[in-house]
């Protein structure tokens, strides 16, 4: 049975990503998937993009990837260049084309024999709405369900969207570094804040084993 490794938000932390893949013991035939936010905030966004491309890994689009793509598209406007100039000057045209090609979600097939279908999104999904019908902003930025039902990108600790998710898919997601590792029957959150000096995390499927490596240092504030 093919093993799948889903990696949380890397944010340019290529050294930690390489260490995590070594800890997972990734070999030919394993499927590696990134849960978005490959770039921005960390030390080596281009290194992450190049590693993902060289490995033939899969990835979904994250909100920071999306923001940086928008800045890149407006790169000839002086005001657009200032905040992300270092990133614009580092990634080449083929790197940007790769980021632009990333989907909002991926369906990975069944989680083992007789298991639920696995899907990867960056942020979240509103319960009861098929993935194909989810709003783009929710897939990229959802964190909470106000009162258990109204979608919000705000961090409301009492109402994580994942706690209300009942499937049918097992969704693996990133984005929510403050809550950290989240483990529910049909939703697993793997953003554990590596770029903020904490850990980089991966979920192995179908075993649901968790792998973690510590950040080398704190690269950015929350």
Regions found by a protein language model. Give the residues of each.
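Active-site neighborhood of divalent metal-dependent phosphoester bond hydrolases
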Residues: 45-127, 131-160
